[in-house]
Amino acid sequence: MKVSSLLSVALPGAALAATDSFQSRCNEFQNKIDIANVTVRSVAYVAAGQNISQAEVASVCKASVQASVDLCRVTMNISTSDRSHLWAEAWLPRNYTGRFVSTGNGGLAGCVQETDLNFAANFGFATVGTNGGHDGDTAKYFLNNSEVLADFAYRSVHEGTVVGKQLTQLFYDEGYNYSYYLGCSTGGRQGYQQVQRFPDDYDGVIAGSAAMNFINLISWGAFLWKATGLADDPDFISADLWSVIHQEIVRQCDLVDGALDGIIEDPDFCAPVIERLICDGTTNGTSCITGAQAAKVNRALSDFYGPDGTVYYPRLNYGGEADSAYLYFTGSMYSRTEEWYKYVVYNDTNWNSSQWTLESAKLALEQNPFNIQAFDPNITAFRDRGGKLLSYHGTQDPIISSTDSKLYYRRVANALNAAPSELDEFYRFFQISGMGHCGDGTGASYIGQGYGTYTSKAPQVNLLRTMVDWVENGKAPEYMPGNKLNANGSIEYMRKHCRYPKHNVHTGPGNYTDPNSWTCV
């Protein structure tokens, strides 16, 4: 099936006839569902433009979503043990193209990513998503319940996929021809988990901004808090001052890539001297920092080492520090970090952040419950069955260091003894300059992995379309196109993001808004 069918539209005459048969099939579908461990909650026809009913969705997960296309929506519980279950949804679109896709979660999971379901359904994918086994972005449900933790660690996406595929085969006479995965952040970790643990689940996996080094990422939140101190510390750095620090880092590193565009193309080539911001007696404290504060900045922007001297987690991306200030540099331990230690590592509601030490980080890594770390570089089974892995990470990510994605790529290269040209056959990783966490940012970050980063003004910039073209037509992406949008939604410029290990350099002759004036070197 050609990729152009992703955007095909049914003829008006055929649509009316299809309406009755599609709605009837949906109305009768609940009576046909008989799948082990599945309790159907509802089956409903939803017309394009209709608001998605969320009566049974956890309140913290409710969001305003309008169906992008006509679809049959199935909500259900999937039992995973006698102490755990998943809330799941399957969206089965009228404009079905013979493709199935599973979506992932975010943060500490807890919510079905309905916007991702809607995005995939819009392009004719039968799609499924789960809540990861609990309600809301919290770790409290893991307390004294290892089964719920197992769902979050690895089980939820796989079980949801198994059920989603069965529903797809039941609903559509033709079944499905190809299966895909789409996820970012925690969803990126889940994508890598699938590649490593369930290599036969998908033909193509899109995993973005992945929290795959999960345990050490959690502990990194504590390290950053310790590095920057409490809010009442006389040398505490406010969010406003972090903005000043950010501007100085960009000033020092912007031209390293050859273009003065306000973007650090690749943080690996940035080596800012923070001490240049130390007050000299003629500047005030709102535009400069003290020597003690400079030391804190350098510590916060350095690698996180465990007690044995090994790197647990790489440094924060230069260029993302201003946004990180609202997460990691608040004077309190990052909430997800504190919850993980309280409800998982120590399994003790009385534990508090003041008790954290480097030994705590060591203990957390040794526990690695249900191998939640998705850092296993041996992905030969996925490669050998013909799977394709497309990964991306924003270089302005304030939550998860993009360097971690580079480290994993190198681990795979070493484990498989494979050169980049050999990895290119099945695994391609793209650095997205100016992208924040899974989107946003100051650069050409609209790469089309969801409604937040897709624009109909550039329909070819669509990660699902890119993956379909690679899996089904053998056309692998040489670069990742991304758009920078104006406030009114128009395209300001496009940039061709490089396939790692190459990086972008502005070589002209045009200015930085000309995509052909950049070279991957």
Swiss-Prot record:
Protein keywords: Calcium, Carbohydrate metabolism, Disulfide bond, Glycoprotein, Hydrolase, Metal-binding, Polysaccharide degradation, Secreted, Serine esterase, Signal, Xylan degradation
GO cellular component terms given for this protein: extracellular region
Glycosylation sites: N37, N51, N77, N95, N144, N177, N284, N347, N352, N378, N488, N511
The keyword Lyase belongs to this UniProt entry's keyword annotation: no
Primary location recorded for the protein, binned into one broad class: secreted
Signal sequence extent: 1-17
Intrachain disulfide bonds: C26-C72, C61-C111, C184-C438, C253-C270, C279-C288, C498-C520
EC number(s) given by UniProt: 3.1.1.73
Enzyme class label: hydrolase
Subcellular location: Secreted
Catalytic residues identified in the record: S185 (acyl-ester intermediate), D397 (charge relay system), H437 (charge relay system)
Molecular-function GO terms, alphabetical: feruloyl esterase activity; metal ion binding; protein homodimerization activity
An annotated GO BP: polysaccharide catabolic process
Family statement: Belongs to the tannase family.
Protein name: Probable feruloyl esterase B
Organism: Aspergillus niger (strain ATCC MYA-4892 / CBS 513.88 / FGSC A1513)
Gene: faeB
